[in-house]
Amino acid sequence: MFIDGKWINREDMDVINPYSLEVIKKIPALSREEAKEAIDTAEKYKEVMKNLPITKRYNILMNIAKQIKEKKEELAKILAIDAGKPIKQARVEVERSIGTFKLAAFYVKEHRDEVIPSDDRLIFTRREPVGIVGAITPFNFPLNLSAHKIAPAIATGNVIVHHPSSKAPLVCIELAKIIENALKKYNVPLGVYNLLTGAGEVVGDEIVVNEKVNMISFTGSSKVGELITKKAGFKKIALELGGVNPNIVLKDADLNKAVNALIKGSFIYAGQVCISVGMILVDESIADKFIEMFVNKAKVLNVGNPLDEKTDVGPLISVEHAEWVEKVVEKAIDEGGKLLLGGKRDKALFYPTILEVDRDNILCKTETFAPVIPIIRTNEEEMIDIANSTEYGLHSAIFTNDINKSLKFAENLEFGGVVINDSSLFRQDNMPFGGVKKSGLGREGVKYAMEEMSNIKTIIISK
């Protein structure tokens, strides 16, 4: 952990390689009292960050991006070992994180305040930092989703208290070293960024309830997100949570395009992406053909060691999660689901699994965070109703060549994002991103996160 510019090295908590199941490192786990002391210390730097010149913010962000680029392969290998992410997918995450820090640097200089028309007053606004941002980040994109919280926090002049997932913290430790170097280079006190490792129910909980923390930016499960809304009090909160993301294939869709996109959207990082394909709704008139093509493509995916360049699907984050997924699939079959492919587990590896189900099946209501895909044969009239029937509303997708139908679905789907002719997995780091219902509050995407992490002050001058 890194607190007030000092590294604290203890061996309190094991970090497990999800593929080999070996202990790869032992890291500190803060007590609640230590977390509280760290937040007390961080508070001293609020004025430092608030008054940090725009040019310094820009330079720090660009320097972080530069250092990440220099360590691209090293960071990708850490992601593969620590989070179980196939190496070719890990490289993509590192590249995206470089872009995220550069985006924040761009928006630092592009920010504009507003002048409000008035007959006899000069009225203008300015955005001010909230103070301390508690950034609580997940295991599945530990580098880029940390970037999505840290970069806009720096850009808006906030102090950061960063709590990474205990399941994949190692790349965040390396990121903290990179941030330390950037702060030193531009003579900024190191206490403006703090990395607090440990158990979520201890460290994460203290960040949420501590009155000195002004905002929580959390990515994780809807269950934990709901707890945060109950505990955070009057803090600002931005929650990017889960989903069972429906992907709709209409009868006029380009099937080759749909199948290729849905294979990627279903099985990248073993389905451990909040916007992975959650269920596929396919028009019954083309269902046989679609299912045959989809299953055949999934059959040839390579499952195995994340460090192998040929691996498409690596392990789930833990054996415990894989065992839970196995039970959910068994229940789905008990409820009448027809297993078309997979259903096999080997330790934390879960093989690509496809089932044909009806709309009431457990898989259509449960975020498995796994390479498990339910397919529903249905008709166009029922698709929107089925898609909107979940308690989530993160991303959805539709495949069609009819522009009128695509717009009709886009207007009626109750989701934060609707992707047309690509899978729900699509996300670009400069677009607004987030969900409705139990999928979250607020929006990420650097520009939009900067708005979340600042407060508008209105200044009125009488003539």
From Swiss-Prot:
Recorded effect of pH on activity: Optimum pH is 9. The activity remained constant to pH 10.0. Below pH 9, the activity gradually declined, and the enzyme was inactive at pH 6 or below.
Record's keyword annotation contains Oxidoreductase: yes
NCBIfam families reported in the protein's UniProt record: lactal_redase_Meth
Subunit structure: Homotetramer.
UniProt keyword list: NAD, Oxidoreductase
Pathway where it operates: Cofactor biosynthesis; coenzyme F420 biosynthesis
Catalytic activity: (S)-lactaldehyde + NAD(+) + H2O = (S)-lactate + NADH + 2 H(+)
Record bears the keyword Oxidoreductase: yes
Name the record gives this protein: Lactaldehyde dehydrogenase
E.C. no: 1.2.1.22
